[in-house]
UniProtKB/Swiss-Prot annotation:
GO terms for biological process: hydrogen peroxide catabolic process. It holds the Pfam family Globin. Heme b binds at H87. Keywords: Acetylation, Heme, Iron, Metal-binding, Oxygen transport, Phosphoprotein, Transport. Red blood cells. The modification Phosphoserine is found at S3, S35, S49, S102, S124, S138. The modification N6-acetyllysine is found at K16. CDD domains: Hb-alpha-like. This is Hemoglobin subunit alpha. O2 binds at H58. The keyword Cell membrane does not apply.
Amino acid sequence: VLSASDKTNLKAAWDKLGGQAANYGAEALERTFASFPTTKTYFPHFDLSPGSAQVKGHGKKVADALTKAVGSLDDLPGALSALSDLHAHKLRVDPVNFKLLSHCLLVTLASHHPADFTPAVHASLDKFLATVSTVLTSKYR
């Protein structure tokens, strides 16, 4: 459960991303594909080379979903319900992949905002991404 402090940290951290959220989403995907090559199997129709339009496009989708989630911290299941259905029933993404992408997103954010990535912010972002992952996999049951 996200505390009031976590919610404050998340909103402040997300505000600092500014217009870079989509770029960070794409970079996190690139890190995921490079570090965990099996994740590429879900994108056989994509050009997965760094900087490709398709990776950038999907990175924007990831960033937009997380931005929506940050704006709906009190109702993440409601905010992410359609996305959960999509990943569980249509795309059938292995739940472990959400954890892998979450890790790569944390690395990406820390590399671009080291001064802002305090232990408290890191913990709040980690809890948030774990909660988002749990919500996205809730329809698998």
